[in-house]
Amino acid sequence: MIIHAYKYHGAGNDFIILDNRKFQYNSLTTEQIKLLCDRHFGIGGDGLMLLEPGNRYEFSMRYFNADGHEGTMCGNGGRCLVAFAAHKGITNFEFEATDGHHHAEILELGERQCIVKLKMIDINQYQQYSENSYFLNTGSPHYVEFVEDVMEYPVDEKGKYWRWHKDFKGGTNVNFVENVWTSVLPKQFGL
């Protein structure tokens, strides 16, 4: 199978994008997607996305994690997919993802750079997990823990622990946040 792949970068993440509007990539397996995302033996990426026809909108987004398994909504990925859709001639940027409807707009479109504004779902609920940690869903699950000093915190160790914690079936994104005066400095583990 010949695969026409595109590579997009957004806010520190990189993604492989395939135009699947004719469903020619529906036969890709978990192992094949994992291999494509492998940074040593494939194209390399934090995930793979398929641009597909939408049911209610012009297009939809299917997201796969780098391990090859289908994932949930990814904001950085969504912005990259909208830029890709624009480069493919799509002009209406309302689309469907696993968490529902999204609206985006292109603020600036260049050949190699695109600025995209993406409306994520509103977060109406969150679950307090401990005194300083919370679980919430932004379209994908997030464990958020407030820490004293994010630069000194063992992000890798704690991130690995929480990423696949038994309470979060299917895994979760892990964010460690330090309050700095009136602003916030986040540091994320994983995707």
List each language-model region with its residue ranges.
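A glycine-rich beta-to-alpha transition motif near the start of alpha/beta enzyme domains, typified by
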Residues: M1-R112, V144-L191
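Active-site glycine-rich loop that binds ribose-phosphate moieties when present
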Residues: L118-N132, P154-K160
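RNA pseudouridine synthases
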Residues: Y126, Y134-L136, V144
